[in-house]
Amino acid sequence: MFHTRNSSQNTAEFVLLDQLVEEDHLLRKIDKHIDFSFIIEKVKPYYSENKGRPSLDPLILFKMMFIGYLYGIRSERQLEKEIYYNMAYRWFLGLNINDPVPHHSTISWNRRTRFKDTTIFQDIFDEIVLQGINHDMVGGRVLFTDSTHLKANANKHKYTRKTIAQDTQNYIKDLNEAIQEDREEHGKKPLTAKEEVKAEKEIRHSTTDPESGYLYRENKPEGFFYLDHRTTDMKYNIITDAYVTSGNVHDSVPYLDRLDHQIARFGFQVEAVALDSGYLTAPICKGLSDRQIFGVIAHRRYHPIRGLFPKWKFHYDSEQDRYICPNHQTLTYSTTDRKGYRSYKSNPEICSSCPLLENCTKSKNRQKVITRHVWEDHKEKVRQNRLSVSGKNLYKKRKEKIERSFADSKQLHGLRYCRLRGKRNVSEQVLLTAACQNMKKIATYLAKQG
């Protein structure tokens, strides 16, 4: 039967705020299973003990931030409004129905002033990971790492051309030692020391956000971006590391340092890692071997010169330290250069009469040259790992773990775009997003356990 209701909006009711929040609400689970008491001790050094007016409770301040990242609320002004109307948010913050909501400028002032140049956001992220470890949700044995791009708050057409010095990689000292040892083994004189000249490169320097980097990769959007280099654990896909670089930094550059950071910070006993093809470099393969870690890295596609034999057509004979060409002739060792590459050269007299010459080389002296890195053995070991049964199973898990983590960040938590400008602000966004994802996962799991 059709019915209408005449309701009045000015009736007085006696209600408990707790009754307005569902029993299975996410914020109830987080409030019950996540211990936020550590925040008080972490932020105490940044407050005065006896000067000024009483501050906003730091727990309320950070819980407001958590709400914003949990529910993808990008604006602090909008966050203030959402808390004003949402009873679950008020309950989580410990605010009564009639209590005023802290002003949005309080959040921004604390971020820009009180917590500027501090490690508070990294500390919060680390503490949440440690809680996951305490609940046996992080194994620390098998890790997945990848990077994703965040669109910088910058116009890609507003930039200047700038020449910068390229940073020296951390592995250079080890590489130089390996080069000298390799030359000695082959009876070559040690390379003379040369004055270090830093290589330079020209980049597009954003005038809007100078710390962002111009991303130009195959199958990727073009423009100014930041990169979130993330690691997740095999067990429950808890994020164990989140590190920000500008968009023009190669994925492989920060990897080993961040791996060591996790091992030192959380005491991980890492046994295996699965990585994308961007990490298939000789230094990373060597680093994994030195750490006795089973590395599985995706195959990187190479594009050989059309009409010429690809490198894999030439077989390396490790016992004789030589290459065998498709016509069963040998390429012998020649030298090892400063970049760590050995050169193997064919006999031009034999090559001149070879029926496969046109498919082998276009050099005027009719000599084929193949290079091999001094750490290539470690790279080949990683390739063998990828083709093994355990390697194939492990790599299948990669897309289910790290890719899923990135998808949740972008679709549910607003990590597709940078909210603010500058590496420090983007790092804050990335760390708090990752921390909130971990909170949600830990709380949901523990709630199911009862």
Model-derived segments and their meaning:
Residues 1-28:
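Hydrophobic alpha-helical membrane-insertion signals
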Residues 3-6, 65, 72-85, 95-450:
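Anion-binding and metal-coordination hotspots
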Residues 10, 23, 36, 57, ...:
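Generic alpha-helical segment signature
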Residues 16, 34-35, 94, 310:
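Short, solvent-exposed coil/turn linker segments
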Residues 23-66:
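Basic, short loop/linker segments at the boundary and entry of helix-turn-helix/winged-helix-like folds
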Residues 89-93:
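Short amphipathic alpha-helical interface patches used for protein-protein assembly/oligomerization
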